[in-house]
């Protein structure tokens, strides 16, 4: 992940490291920052942002600032989709891959056990190139699911 993050920084992107799991993610973020600083202590690190996140509202605020979200967390994927954000999902569990597939975004889901920086870069570039269309599709899918949920609520309330 350090090589991918450095690639993003070197190509002019701002990288926000935001926790969606409040116990383990801060440890990962700290380790990632240390690794990046060790590899490249002066390389565009002013665009590497790691603001503390301790509430749902702060998570949503951080995700809202992103144009593309790269996450391995299920809730990071869900919240990003709800915000209409394109997601590069690093899948550690089938539920992440399944959600990406359900949203028509399975081509932007990578298995964490076979993860390589080059594959992340390639998928990120594809997502960046198509992010307008991808965002539109995600918003349409979210609207479709909201409508289905409203129908389910109406049916349950009539029981």
Can you say where each PLM-predicted feature lies in the sequence?
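Active-site anion-handling motifs in enzyme catalytic cores
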Residues: 1-159
């Amino acid at each position: 992940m350090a090589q991918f993050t450095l690639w993003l920084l070197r190509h002019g992107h701002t990288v926000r490291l935001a926790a969606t799991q409040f116990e383990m993610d801060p440890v990962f973020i700290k380790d990632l920052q240390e690794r990046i600083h060790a590899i490249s202590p002066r390389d565009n690190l002013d665009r590497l942002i790691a603001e503390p996140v301790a509430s749902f509202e702060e998570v949503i605020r951080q995700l809202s600032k992103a144009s593309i979200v790269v996450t391995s967390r299920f809730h990071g994927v869900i919240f990003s989709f709800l915000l209409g954000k394109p997601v590069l999902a690093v899948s550690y569990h089938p539920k992440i891959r399944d959600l990406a597939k359900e949203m028509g975004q399975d081509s932007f889901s990578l298995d964490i056990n076979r993860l390589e920086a080059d594959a992340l870069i390639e998928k990120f570039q594809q997502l960046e190139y198509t992010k307008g269309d991808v965002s539109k599709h995600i918003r349409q899918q979210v609207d479709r699911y909201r409508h289905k949920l409203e129908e389910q609520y109406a049916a349950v309330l009539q029981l």
